[in-house]
Amino acid sequence: MKVRSRPRIVVIYNRDFEGAEADPENKAREDVKDVAQDVLRILGASGFETGELGVTNDIPEALSALVAMKPNAVFNLCESIHGDNRFESLMPLLMDLSNIAYTGSCPFGLSLALRKEKVKDILLGSGVPVARGGLVTCVGDCARLEIAFPAIVKPAREDASVGICSASVIHNQTALEQRVAYVLETYRQPALVEEFIEGREIYASILESVDGEPTVFPFFEIDFSDMPSDRPNIVSFEGKWVEDSIEYKGTRPVRCEGLSTELRACIAKTALNAFRAVGLRDYGRIDFRLSPAGVPYAIDVNPNCDLSDLAGGYSRAAKAAGLSYKELILRIVTLALTRHERASTIALHPAAAAVSADVPGAVILQREVEASAPRGGAGSA
């Protein structure tokens, strides 16, 4: 059997930001292509063979093309199909069936994370605090909710802050019913209604090692000090994606300071519990609202958080932990390669050696890759 001298990594990403299915909230999908190009550049410069596949709505064609490329692993950036992120798990499922290794969470974790009401139940059962609330499928359901105002209303099956704006935070029953009606009609899915937790918004980013041990990066939080007083302190869609908006300027990510050692440990432990409970893999981020009483309430579980270099909160946290963007991408690729049954036939060392030895964390990455290689050498069958 001929052993490939260099692993081939194919980067896949969704192309549903193009054409008729594009929508006004398209920015959240369109940025994925820029991330794909950054990843391809890093992998190519690090000694990997690379391939690129933009996934369209023709899934059989996409799978056939991917199989023909014979990747040793896939860097998965395919976050939606047909403009619908409910199909985020489809390509990972097909790759599992085709015995193709890929980065990130498995179909179960990806699908579950989009069922926000189910995630709340699982988190609650795992001892992770969540805001009181419920799923609403019609306006009439609002009357049965046992919540206190203010509350927040958001689409139950979206991510990337899609469907969240200043009007999402409501203060009375009439506003609740109006906002629920808007979500049901606009997004054609149930609405999730939760008590709004006043307090700091803190992000805990997590990265696994090749032995499966997760590490929590330094926390970041949102600085709302420049948010106008007539707007709620939330990260809306505009706050996340529209750079010239008031919300964007009022939601500045900063290092999380001023937490006691005990509270930091509590948030880290809670984040790891949430990561495991929802079935995330390789990397992810848990978002919290810290109540005035010091309770970290999990408000979102992100299996496919933004991996962009400059604007991405996840890469920002990795850099705070001493990992360069290049190291982060190589670490994630290594996780996929070492997980696959064919990893013993792949020469992993050149890619690891491409990481500069004077960059913090490079030695750790090298050791992880070496530990994953078979005793007889990286090229043994």
Where are these regions (language model features)?
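Short acidic, glycine/proline-rich loop/turn micro-motifs
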Residues: A20-E25, V162-C165, A311-Y314
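Flexible, glycine-rich phosphate/dinucleotide-binding loops
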Residues: E18-G19, I59, C142, D159, ...
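Active-site nucleotide/adenylate-binding loops and adjacent lid/helix of ATP-dependent enzymes
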Residues: K2-Y13, L66-K70, S111-L192, I197-R200, ...
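ATP-binding N-terminal substructure of ATP-dependent carboxylate-amine bond-forming enzymes
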Residues: M1-A101, P107-F108, L112-L114, K118, ...
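Phosphate-binding site of ATP-dependent enzymes
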Residues: Q173-K269, P292-Y297
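Hydrophobic beta-strand scaffold residues
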Residues: T50, A101-Y102, V130, A151, ...
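ATP-dependent carboxylate activation and anion-phosphoryl transfer catalytic cores
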Residues: I122-L124, E257-A381
